[in-house]
Amino acid sequence: MKSRDKAILKDLHRFRCLSRDDIIDLHFQGLKKAVTSCNTVMKRLRRDGSVDVNVSQQPYIYFPQPSTIRKTSQKIPHFLAIVNVYKQLLQYEKPKLFKVEPKYGKGYMEPDIFTIWRQSPFFIEVQNSIYSKKMMQEKLSRYEFYFHSLEWQQEPWQPNKSKYFPSLLVITDSQYDIYSPNFRIFQAKSIHDFMNQMAVKA
């Protein structure tokens, strides 16, 4: 199997699913006939039984085989939104680490993403829908609970000397009245919007 095939399958497992255009952006950038090349490769991987596909959507949505989600799952737009955040991060710098829906234990937060990007750790929440103030406070309280547990100091990515609690970045079209005295919270409509906010502060 070619290294690009392996990289595509690795991303399909990591992101749960990818649209044909996502695969082009991540693995066929710069090719003259990127669409044709991608279609040919994905057709072969499908024939080999390495991937599954939902052809009822345009562009096609591809899944690893076996897949952890159904081809008709309601969470597909959510996972594709996570891919979109990853692609936006890449435009500035490739993340050193990028985990999709990492698990931290009972009672703790369930971020959509944990990433180390531009030498900084971030929890990222990708919000496609509007949450009530109560729901946002409940989300935030789980981060606070994790902060006070000090378990984050044992994370394998932590430096030996200083320990850092990740910043929380909420990707949302709505602004929420949320604050923590223990860690930084950012709200932005996109990674580009977030970078513009940082540029203004700098």
List each model region and its residues.
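Charged, structured surface patches that assemble and position nucleic-acid processing machinery
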Residues: 182-202
